[in-house]
Amino acid sequence: MLATDSDPIVAIATAAGRGGIGVVRVSFGRGGEAAALPLIDALCGQQLAPRHASYVPFVDEHGAPLDRGIALYFPAPHSYTGEHVLELQGHGGPIVMQLLLQRCLDAGRGFGLRLAQPGEFTRRAFLNDKLDLAQAEAVADLIEASTEAAARSAGRSLDGAFSRQIHALVEDVITLRMLVEATLDFPEEEIDFLEAADARGKLARIREQLAHVLGDARQGALLREGLSVVLAGQPNVGKSSLLNALAGAELAIVTPIAGTTRDKVAQTIQVEGIPLHIIDTAGLRETEDEVERIGIARTWSEIERADVVLHLLDSRTGMTADDEVIAARFPGGVPVVRVLNKTDLTGVPACVEHPAAAGDLTEVHLSAKRGDGIDMLRAELLRIAGWQAGAEGVYLARERHLIALRAAQEHLAQAADHAEQRAQSLDLFAEELRLAQEQLNAITGEFTSDDLLGVIFSRFCIGK
Protein backbone atom coordinates (compact mmCIF):
# COMPACT_ATOMS: atom_id res chain seq x y z
CA MET A 1 0.00 0.00 0.00
CA LEU A 2 1.32 3.45 -0.93
CA ALA A 3 2.00 5.82 1.95
CA THR A 4 -0.42 8.75 2.15
CA ASP A 5 -0.73 11.84 4.32
CA SER A 6 -3.79 10.34 6.01
CA ASP A 7 -2.25 7.04 7.17
CA PRO A 8 -1.90 6.42 10.91
CA ILE A 9 1.84 6.67 11.68
CA VAL A 10 4.19 5.81 14.55
CA ALA A 11 7.86 6.42 15.33
CA ILE A 12 10.33 6.74 18.16
CA ALA A 13 10.48 10.51 18.75
CA THR A 14 13.66 10.65 20.82
CA ALA A 15 17.26 10.32 19.72
CA ALA A 16 18.87 6.91 19.31
CA GLY A 17 20.89 5.55 22.21
CA ARG A 18 20.31 5.28 25.94
CA GLY A 19 18.66 7.96 28.06
CA GLY A 20 16.45 8.51 31.05
CA ILE A 21 13.33 8.86 28.91
CA GLY A 22 12.32 7.68 25.46
CA VAL A 23 9.16 8.64 23.57
CA VAL A 24 7.08 6.74 21.04
CA ARG A 25 4.62 8.96 19.15
CA VAL A 26 1.51 7.90 17.24
CA SER A 27 -0.56 10.19 15.00
CA PHE A 28 -3.78 8.49 13.96
CA GLY A 29 -4.54 10.26 10.68
CA ARG A 30 -7.79 9.16 9.08
CA GLY A 31 -8.26 6.53 11.80
CA GLY A 32 -9.12 9.22 14.33
CA GLU A 33 -10.74 8.27 17.60
CA ALA A 34 -11.94 4.93 16.21
CA ALA A 35 -8.31 3.84 15.92
CA ALA A 36 -6.93 5.71 18.93
CA LEU A 37 -9.17 4.31 21.65
CA PRO A 38 -8.62 0.58 20.90
CA LEU A 39 -4.85 1.10 20.61
CA ILE A 40 -4.73 2.97 23.92
CA ASP A 41 -6.68 0.18 25.60
CA ALA A 42 -4.40 -2.48 24.08
CA LEU A 43 -1.19 -0.74 25.17
CA CYS A 44 -2.19 0.76 28.51
CA GLY A 45 -5.01 -1.51 29.66
CA GLN A 46 -7.25 1.54 30.24
CA GLN A 47 -8.53 4.68 28.59
CA LEU A 48 -6.75 8.00 29.13
CA ALA A 49 -8.12 11.40 30.07
CA PRO A 50 -7.35 13.83 27.22
CA ARG A 51 -4.28 16.01 27.80
CA HIS A 52 -3.59 14.49 31.22
CA ALA A 53 -0.44 12.57 32.13
CA SER A 54 -1.24 9.02 33.26
CA TYR A 55 1.32 6.71 34.87
CA VAL A 56 0.45 3.30 33.44
CA PRO A 57 1.98 -0.06 32.54
CA PHE A 58 2.70 -0.65 28.84
CA VAL A 59 1.72 -4.24 28.11
CA ASP A 60 2.20 -6.79 25.32
CA GLU A 61 -0.57 -8.72 23.58
CA HIS A 62 -0.78 -11.13 26.54
CA GLY A 63 -1.05 -8.37 29.13
CA ALA A 64 2.52 -8.88 30.34
CA PRO A 65 4.34 -5.61 31.18
CA LEU A 66 6.91 -4.21 28.74
CA ASP A 67 7.59 -1.06 30.75
CA ARG A 68 5.89 1.52 32.95
CA GLY A 69 5.72 5.18 32.05
CA ILE A 70 3.66 8.23 31.19
CA ALA A 71 0.95 8.08 28.53
CA LEU A 72 -0.52 11.26 27.01
CA TYR A 73 -3.51 11.39 24.67
CA PHE A 74 -4.19 14.53 22.61
CA PRO A 75 -7.50 14.43 20.70
CA ALA A 76 -7.65 16.39 17.45
CA PRO A 77 -7.26 19.21 16.69
CA HIS A 78 -5.38 20.11 19.88
CA SER A 79 -2.15 18.23 19.16
CA TYR A 80 1.18 18.74 17.42
CA THR A 81 -0.07 17.30 14.12
CA GLY A 82 -3.67 18.45 14.40
CA GLU A 83 -4.72 14.77 14.46
CA HIS A 84 -5.43 12.43 17.36
CA VAL A 85 -2.00 11.80 18.92
CA LEU A 86 -0.72 9.35 21.54
CA GLU A 87 2.67 9.69 23.23
CA LEU A 88 4.22 6.94 25.33
CA GLN A 89 7.09 8.08 27.55
CA GLY A 90 9.06 5.11 28.80
CA HIS A 91 12.60 4.36 29.89
CA GLY A 92 15.02 5.42 27.19
CA GLY A 93 16.80 2.19 26.38
CA PRO A 94 16.93 1.14 22.71
CA ILE A 95 15.47 -2.32 23.41
CA VAL A 96 12.54 -0.91 25.41
CA MET A 97 11.82 1.64 22.69
CA GLN A 98 11.91 -1.00 19.96
CA LEU A 99 9.56 -3.22 21.98
CA LEU A 100 7.07 -0.37 22.41
CA LEU A 101 7.34 0.58 18.74
CA GLN A 102 6.75 -2.99 17.59
CA ARG A 103 3.86 -3.37 20.02
CA CYS A 104 2.21 -0.28 18.52
CA LEU A 105 2.68 -1.62 14.99
CA ASP A 106 1.26 -5.03 15.91
CA ALA A 107 -1.73 -3.57 17.75
CA GLY A 108 -2.40 -1.04 14.98
CA ARG A 109 -2.08 -3.41 12.04
CA GLY A 110 -5.85 -3.61 11.70
CA PHE A 111 -6.23 0.09 10.89
CA GLY A 112 -3.09 0.44 8.78
CA LEU A 113 -0.62 1.89 11.28
CA ARG A 114 2.81 2.24 9.66
CA LEU A 115 6.25 3.66 10.45
CA ALA A 116 6.50 7.40 9.94
CA GLN A 117 8.80 8.83 7.30
CA PRO A 118 11.40 11.50 8.22
CA GLY A 119 9.65 14.74 9.14
CA GLU A 120 6.18 13.30 8.62
CA PHE A 121 4.75 14.46 11.95
CA THR A 122 5.81 18.05 11.22
CA ARG A 123 4.60 17.75 7.61
CA ARG A 124 1.16 16.89 8.96
CA ALA A 125 1.31 19.84 11.34
CA PHE A 126 1.91 21.99 8.24
CA LEU A 127 -0.83 20.35 6.17
CA ASN A 128 -3.29 20.71 9.07
CA ASP A 129 -2.46 24.42 9.54
CA LYS A 130 -0.78 23.99 12.91
CA LEU A 131 2.42 25.51 11.50
CA ASP A 132 3.27 27.34 8.30
CA LEU A 133 6.24 26.17 6.25
CA ALA A 134 8.73 28.64 7.71
CA GLN A 135 7.74 27.54 11.23
CA ALA A 136 7.99 23.88 10.24
CA GLU A 137 11.54 24.45 8.97
CA ALA A 138 12.33 26.22 12.24
CA VAL A 139 11.56 22.97 14.10
CA ALA A 140 14.44 21.24 12.29
CA ASP A 141 16.66 24.30 12.66
CA LEU A 142 16.06 24.39 16.41
CA ILE A 143 17.03 20.73 16.70
CA GLU A 144 20.15 21.22 14.57
CA ALA A 145 21.25 24.57 16.03
CA SER A 146 24.99 24.59 16.67
CA THR A 147 25.13 27.79 18.74
CA GLU A 148 23.01 29.43 21.42
CA ALA A 149 22.30 32.38 19.12
CA ALA A 150 21.09 30.02 16.37
CA ALA A 151 18.84 28.17 18.83
CA ARG A 152 17.29 31.40 20.10
CA SER A 153 16.73 32.65 16.55
CA ALA A 154 15.16 29.33 15.52
CA GLY A 155 12.88 29.64 18.54
CA ARG A 156 11.76 33.06 17.33
CA SER A 157 11.05 31.63 13.88
CA LEU A 158 9.08 28.77 15.41
CA ASP A 159 7.11 31.33 17.42
CA GLY A 160 6.16 32.97 14.11
CA ALA A 161 8.37 36.10 14.11
CA PHE A 162 9.57 35.54 10.53
CA SER A 163 6.14 34.45 9.30
CA ARG A 164 4.45 37.54 10.74
CA GLN A 165 6.84 39.76 8.80
CA ILE A 166 6.06 37.87 5.59
CA HIS A 167 2.30 37.93 6.18
CA ALA A 168 2.42 41.70 6.75
CA LEU A 169 4.25 42.17 3.46
CA VAL A 170 1.77 39.94 1.62
CA GLU A 171 -1.19 41.89 3.02
CA ASP A 172 0.35 45.17 1.88
CA VAL A 173 1.02 43.78 -1.60
CA ILE A 174 -2.57 42.48 -1.83
CA THR A 175 -3.93 45.90 -0.85
CA LEU A 176 -1.84 47.53 -3.56
CA ARG A 177 -2.91 44.91 -6.10
CA MET A 178 -6.56 45.71 -5.35
CA LEU A 179 -5.95 49.38 -6.21
CA VAL A 180 -4.26 48.49 -9.48
CA GLU A 181 -6.98 46.00 -10.40
CA ALA A 182 -9.66 48.61 -9.62
CA THR A 183 -7.98 51.07 -11.98
CA LEU A 184 -7.78 48.39 -14.68
CA ASP A 185 -11.38 47.24 -14.20
CA PHE A 186 -12.95 50.70 -14.13
CA PRO A 187 -10.97 52.84 -16.59
CA GLU A 188 -14.00 55.03 -17.29
CA GLU A 189 -14.29 56.21 -13.68
CA GLU A 190 -13.17 59.74 -12.99
CA ILE A 191 -11.50 58.67 -9.75
CA ASP A 192 -7.79 57.86 -10.12
CA PHE A 193 -7.49 55.01 -7.62
CA LEU A 194 -3.70 54.97 -7.74
CA GLU A 195 -3.28 58.69 -7.16
CA ALA A 196 -6.03 58.85 -4.54
CA ALA A 197 -4.46 56.05 -2.49
CA ASP A 198 -0.83 57.13 -3.01
CA ALA A 199 0.03 53.84 -4.72
CA ARG A 200 3.61 54.85 -5.43
CA GLY A 201 4.15 55.80 -1.81
CA LYS A 202 2.67 52.48 -0.69
CA LEU A 203 4.95 50.59 -3.06
CA ALA A 204 7.99 52.49 -1.79
CA ARG A 205 7.10 51.60 1.80
CA ILE A 206 6.62 47.93 0.88
CA ARG A 207 10.04 47.88 -0.79
CA GLU A 208 11.61 49.53 2.24
CA GLN A 209 10.06 46.98 4.59
CA LEU A 210 11.10 44.10 2.33
CA ALA A 211 14.69 45.37 2.37
CA HIS A 212 14.56 45.36 6.18
CA VAL A 213 13.20 41.79 6.27
CA LEU A 214 15.85 40.65 3.78
CA GLY A 215 18.56 42.19 5.94
CA ASP A 216 17.30 40.34 9.01
CA ALA A 217 17.00 37.14 6.98
CA ARG A 218 20.63 37.43 5.87
CA GLN A 219 21.64 37.69 9.52
CA GLY A 220 19.51 34.65 10.34
CA ALA A 221 20.99 32.65 7.47
CA LEU A 222 24.46 33.49 8.74
CA LEU A 223 23.53 32.17 12.19
CA ARG A 224 22.26 28.96 10.63
CA GLU A 225 24.89 28.29 7.97
CA GLY A 226 27.94 30.05 9.36
CA LEU A 227 30.94 31.00 7.24
CA SER A 228 33.41 28.67 5.51
CA VAL A 229 36.92 30.10 5.98
CA VAL A 230 39.84 28.46 4.14
CA LEU A 231 43.45 29.05 5.21
CA ALA A 232 45.62 29.04 2.08
CA GLY A 233 49.21 29.89 1.25
CA GLN A 234 52.68 28.52 0.74
CA PRO A 235 54.09 25.89 3.11
CA ASN A 236 55.39 27.06 6.47
CA VAL A 237 53.65 30.44 6.60
CA GLY A 238 51.76 29.43 9.76
CA LYS A 239 48.40 28.15 8.53
CA SER A 240 48.24 25.36 11.12
CA SER A 241 49.39 27.73 13.85
CA LEU A 242 46.60 30.13 12.87
CA LEU A 243 44.02 27.34 12.99
CA ASN A 244 45.18 26.44 16.49
CA ALA A 245 45.11 30.10 17.56
CA LEU A 246 41.59 30.65 16.22
CA ALA A 247 40.32 27.42 17.79
CA GLY A 248 42.15 27.92 21.06
CA ALA A 249 43.38 24.32 20.91
CA GLU A 250 46.19 22.26 19.39
CA LEU A 251 44.27 20.74 16.49
CA ALA A 252 46.89 20.74 13.76
CA ILE A 253 50.48 19.52 13.91
CA VAL A 254 52.94 22.41 13.76
CA THR A 255 56.56 21.78 12.68
CA PRO A 256 59.20 23.76 10.79
CA ILE A 257 59.12 21.09 8.08
CA ALA A 258 57.42 22.34 4.90
CA GLY A 259 54.51 20.16 3.77
CA THR A 260 53.58 18.84 7.23
CA THR A 261 49.87 19.35 6.51
CA ARG A 262 48.88 17.12 3.59
CA ASP A 263 45.12 16.96 4.04
CA LYS A 264 42.63 19.44 5.36
CA VAL A 265 42.03 19.90 9.09
CA ALA A 266 38.67 21.50 9.92
CA GLN A 267 37.26 23.02 13.07
CA THR A 268 34.13 25.05 13.77
CA ILE A 269 34.46 27.93 16.21
CA GLN A 270 31.91 30.47 17.43
CA VAL A 271 32.38 34.21 17.21
CA GLU A 272 29.44 36.21 18.60
CA GLY A 273 27.25 33.17 17.98
CA ILE A 274 28.29 32.82 14.32
CA PRO A 275 29.73 29.41 13.36
CA LEU A 276 33.03 29.89 11.55
CA HIS A 277 34.09 26.70 9.77
CA ILE A 278 37.89 27.06 9.66
CA ILE A 279 39.72 24.78 7.21
CA ASP A 280 43.51 24.38 7.31
CA THR A 281 44.89 23.10 4.02
CA ALA A 282 48.06 21.76 2.45
CA GLY A 283 50.68 24.35 1.51
CA LEU A 284 50.49 25.47 -2.12
CA ARG A 285 53.68 24.78 -4.09
CA GLU A 286 55.09 22.71 -6.93
CA THR A 287 56.00 19.24 -5.68
CA GLU A 288 56.88 15.77 -6.98
CA ASP A 289 55.41 14.08 -3.89
CA GLU A 290 52.24 12.33 -5.08
CA VAL A 291 50.52 12.41 -1.67
CA GLU A 292 51.27 16.11 -1.25
CA ARG A 293 50.00 16.83 -4.77
CA ILE A 294 46.69 15.19 -3.91
CA GLY A 295 46.48 17.37 -0.80
CA ILE A 296 47.18 20.50 -2.86
CA ALA A 297 44.45 19.56 -5.35
CA ARG A 298 42.04 19.24 -2.44
CA THR A 299 43.16 22.66 -1.19
CA TRP A 300 42.07 24.26 -4.45
CA SER A 301 38.74 22.44 -4.25
CA GLU A 302 38.18 23.88 -0.77
CA ILE A 303 39.12 27.35 -2.00
CA GLU A 304 36.50 27.09 -4.77
CA ARG A 305 33.80 26.35 -2.15
CA ALA A 306 34.94 28.90 0.45
CA ASP A 307 32.99 31.91 1.67
CA VAL A 308 36.26 33.63 2.63
CA VAL A 309 39.91 32.82 1.86
CA LEU A 310 42.65 33.82 4.29
CA HIS A 311 45.80 34.12 2.17
CA LEU A 312 48.66 33.67 4.61
CA LEU A 313 52.00 35.34 3.98
CA ASP A 314 55.22 35.47 5.94
CA SER A 315 55.49 39.05 7.21
CA ARG A 316 59.27 38.86 6.79
CA THR A 317 58.99 38.51 3.02
CA GLY A 318 55.60 40.00 2.28
CA MET A 319 53.96 39.27 -1.06
CA THR A 320 56.45 37.20 -3.10
CA ALA A 321 56.28 36.20 -6.74
CA ASP A 322 55.03 32.75 -5.72
CA ASP A 323 52.31 34.39 -3.60
CA GLU A 324 51.28 36.46 -6.63
CA VAL A 325 50.86 33.26 -8.64
CA ILE A 326 48.70 31.77 -5.89
CA ALA A 327 46.57 34.92 -5.56
CA ALA A 328 45.97 35.01 -9.31
CA ARG A 329 44.28 31.61 -9.11
CA PHE A 330 41.80 32.58 -6.40
CA PRO A 331 38.23 32.49 -7.77
CA GLY A 332 36.58 35.81 -8.47
CA GLY A 333 33.77 36.79 -6.14
CA VAL A 334 35.28 35.10 -3.07
CA PRO A 335 36.50 37.64 -0.49
CA VAL A 336 40.22 37.32 0.26
CA VAL A 337 42.00 38.59 3.37
CA ARG A 338 45.78 38.79 3.31
CA VAL A 339 47.14 37.64 6.64
CA LEU A 340 50.75 38.61 7.26
CA ASN A 341 51.79 36.19 9.98
CA LYS A 342 54.88 36.00 12.21
CA THR A 343 54.93 39.65 13.29
CA ASP A 344 56.67 38.38 16.43
CA LEU A 345 59.75 38.00 14.21
CA THR A 346 59.52 41.44 12.60
CA GLY A 347 58.38 43.62 15.47
CA VAL A 348 55.47 44.98 13.40
CA PRO A 349 52.47 45.61 15.69
CA ALA A 350 49.27 43.69 15.06
CA CYS A 351 46.88 45.76 12.97
CA VAL A 352 44.30 45.81 10.18
CA GLU A 353 45.15 47.79 7.05
CA HIS A 354 43.46 48.63 3.74
CA PRO A 355 46.42 49.51 1.51
CA ALA A 356 45.51 51.36 -1.67
CA ALA A 357 47.71 49.07 -3.76
CA ALA A 358 45.67 46.05 -2.62
CA GLY A 359 42.36 47.36 -3.96
CA ASP A 360 39.45 45.99 -1.94
CA LEU A 361 41.65 43.55 -0.05
CA THR A 362 42.17 43.83 3.68
CA GLU A 363 45.52 43.02 5.27
CA VAL A 364 45.74 41.75 8.84
CA HIS A 365 49.15 41.73 10.52
CA LEU A 366 49.30 39.21 13.36
CA SER A 367 51.27 36.61 15.23
CA ALA A 368 49.53 33.25 15.39
CA LYS A 369 52.27 32.01 17.72
CA ARG A 370 51.69 34.73 20.34
CA GLY A 371 48.01 35.36 19.61
CA ASP A 372 48.55 39.02 18.74
CA GLY A 373 45.89 40.28 16.30
CA ILE A 374 43.68 37.16 16.43
CA ASP A 375 40.71 39.16 17.75
CA MET A 376 41.22 41.65 14.92
CA LEU A 377 41.03 38.81 12.41
CA ARG A 378 37.84 37.45 13.98
CA ALA A 379 36.28 40.92 13.79
CA GLU A 380 37.30 41.25 10.14
CA LEU A 381 35.66 37.92 9.30
CA LEU A 382 32.41 39.08 10.91
CA ARG A 383 32.61 42.35 8.97
CA ILE A 384 33.01 40.49 5.69
CA ALA A 385 30.07 38.26 6.58
CA GLY A 386 27.91 41.34 7.15
CA TRP A 387 27.15 40.48 10.76
CA GLN A 388 25.63 43.29 12.81
CA ALA A 389 26.82 42.94 16.37
CA GLY A 390 24.05 42.89 18.95
CA ALA A 391 21.27 42.51 16.36
CA GLU A 392 18.00 41.94 18.21
CA GLY A 393 15.03 39.92 17.06
CA VAL A 394 16.87 38.03 14.33
CA TYR A 395 15.04 34.94 13.12
CA LEU A 396 16.67 31.97 11.45
CA ALA A 397 16.38 31.84 7.67
CA ARG A 398 17.38 29.42 4.94
CA GLU A 399 18.87 29.92 1.51
CA ARG A 400 15.49 29.30 -0.14
CA HIS A 401 14.02 32.14 1.93
CA LEU A 402 16.76 34.50 0.75
CA ILE A 403 16.19 33.47 -2.87
CA ALA A 404 12.44 34.12 -2.56
CA LEU A 405 12.96 37.49 -0.85
CA ARG A 406 15.45 38.62 -3.50
CA ALA A 407 13.06 37.53 -6.26
CA ALA A 408 10.20 39.45 -4.61
CA GLN A 409 12.50 42.46 -4.32
CA GLU A 410 13.26 42.29 -8.05
CA HIS A 411 9.56 42.02 -8.97
CA LEU A 412 8.73 45.05 -6.82
CA ALA A 413 11.55 47.01 -8.48
CA GLN A 414 10.04 46.14 -11.86
CA ALA A 415 6.63 47.16 -10.56
CA ALA A 416 8.03 50.55 -9.55
CA ASP A 417 9.37 51.05 -13.08
CA HIS A 418 5.98 50.19 -14.60
CA ALA A 419 4.18 52.45 -12.13
CA GLU A 420 6.06 55.42 -13.55
CA GLN A 421 4.74 54.63 -17.03
CA ARG A 422 1.11 54.37 -15.83
CA ALA A 423 -1.29 53.68 -18.69
CA GLN A 424 1.28 52.00 -20.94
CA SER A 425 2.33 49.47 -18.28
CA LEU A 426 -0.50 49.13 -15.77
CA ASP A 427 -1.07 45.47 -16.66
CA LEU A 428 2.63 44.78 -16.17
CA PHE A 429 2.53 46.66 -12.86
CA ALA A 430 -0.23 44.34 -11.65
CA GLU A 431 1.60 41.24 -12.89
CA GLU A 432 4.84 42.14 -11.09
CA LEU A 433 2.89 42.62 -7.86
CA ARG A 434 1.30 39.19 -8.34
CA LEU A 435 4.69 37.57 -8.89
CA ALA A 436 6.13 39.29 -5.81
CA GLN A 437 3.22 37.99 -3.73
CA GLU A 438 3.78 34.49 -5.13
CA GLN A 439 7.43 34.54 -4.01
CA LEU A 440 6.51 35.72 -0.51
CA ASN A 441 3.78 33.09 -0.20
CA ALA A 442 6.32 30.39 -1.10
CA ILE A 443 8.21 31.18 2.12
CA THR A 444 5.27 30.34 4.37
CA GLY A 445 4.02 27.53 2.14
CA GLU A 446 0.84 29.13 0.82
CA PHE A 447 2.22 28.65 -2.68
CA THR A 448 4.63 25.72 -2.65
CA SER A 449 5.10 22.67 -4.87
CA ASP A 450 4.75 19.15 -3.51
CA ASP A 451 8.29 18.43 -4.70
CA LEU A 452 9.68 21.21 -2.50
CA LEU A 453 7.70 19.94 0.48
CA GLY A 454 9.15 16.48 -0.06
CA VAL A 455 12.71 17.84 -0.07
CA ILE A 456 12.18 19.99 3.03
CA PHE A 457 10.57 17.35 5.24
CA SER A 458 12.82 14.49 4.09
CA ARG A 459 15.69 16.25 5.89
CA PHE A 460 13.98 16.01 9.27
CA CYS A 461 14.72 13.22 11.71
CA ILE A 462 12.26 10.33 12.00
CA GLY A 463 9.78 10.94 14.81
CA LYS A 464 9.62 14.70 14.19
From Swiss-Prot:
Organism, by scientific name, is: Burkholderia ambifaria (strain MC40-6)
The organism's place on the tree of life at top rank: Bacteria
Give the classification, highest ranks. Answer: Bacteria, Pseudomonadati, Pseudomonadota, Betaproteobacteria, Burkholderiales
Query: Does GTP-binding appear among the keywords?
Result: yes
**For Mg(2+), which residues are the binding ones?**
S240, T261
- Stated name of the protein: tRNA modification GTPase MnmE
- Residue ranges annotated as coiled coil are none
What task does this protein carry out?
Exhibits a very high intrinsic GTPase hydrolysis rate. Involved in the addition of a carboxymethylaminomethyl (cmnm) group at the wobble position (U34) of certain tRNAs, forming tRNA-cmnm(5)s(2)U34.
An example GO CC term for this entry is: cytosol
A molecular function (GO) term: GTPase activity
Subunit composition?
Answer: Homodimer. Heterotetramer of two MnmE and two MnmG subunits.
